[in-house]
Amino acid sequence: MKKKFLFMIPLCLFIIDYFLIKYQVIQSIDWFIYHLVQNLKCDFMTSFFKLCSTLGSTWFYVILVLTLVILKNKKDIWVGIHLLIIQGMNRIIKALVKRPRPPQIYHLVKETNYSFPSGHSMSAMIGYGLLVLEVQKSSLKYKKVIEIFLIGLSRIYLGVHYFSDVIGGFLLSLSYLLFIYYNTSLYT
């Protein structure tokens, strides 16, 4: 398969994830994983996952984008633009799908909008995913992949997303990431 079409694989998986949610096929898996992660709660883990969540937050990326604009590195500015595009896509999809978040009784952070797909997961995949593709040092690549995973996991731990929300966010952003990486002149 040509690399320029690789984006279709995670896109198709995202669509499948959406339909599994819509028709409540994945609901029991979502609740199983949700409660499994919820049972890990302790003060240290809560502090740790709040930090992880902050590294995937909109405010973190706003500050990052402004810093990149000030530094005027053209390639870095594009990372910021991609993050903004992903956040826009996320808001539109959430407004269309309107999946409620898990019950507020489990929330360790305040969230008011809809659940699917996870915006933190989408931003992490783009922001850190571009680094994974660009960086030559393999140890840094592994660290960034772990950060992406931890940001997604943090959203389940903090009680504001289901597993399928996080997976959906990862898949949609991975699709976008592969599309821009293999189909634009910025990265080829």
Describe the residue ranges of each PLM region.
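Membrane-helix interfacial "entry" motifs
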Residues: N39-K50, L71, K75, V109, ...
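Hydrophobic transmembrane alpha-helices of multi-pass, membrane-embedded glycosylation machinery
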Residues: L64-L71, F149, F170-L171
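Membrane helix-loop-helix hairpins that form the core translocation module of multi-pass transporters
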Residues: S47, I85-I92, I167, S173
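N-terminal transmembrane-helix/juxtamembrane module of multi-pass inner/ER membrane proteins
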Residues: M1-F60, K94-L108
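Membrane-interface loops
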Residues: W59, V69-S138
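Membrane-embedded catalytic cores of phosphoryl/pyrophosphoryl-handling enzymes
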Residues: H107-T188
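Aromatic-anchored segments of alpha-helical transmembrane domains
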Residues: L13-Y18, I85-I92, I146-V160
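Alpha-helical transmembrane segments of integral membrane proteins
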Residues: F5-I9, F49, K74-H82, L140-I146, ...
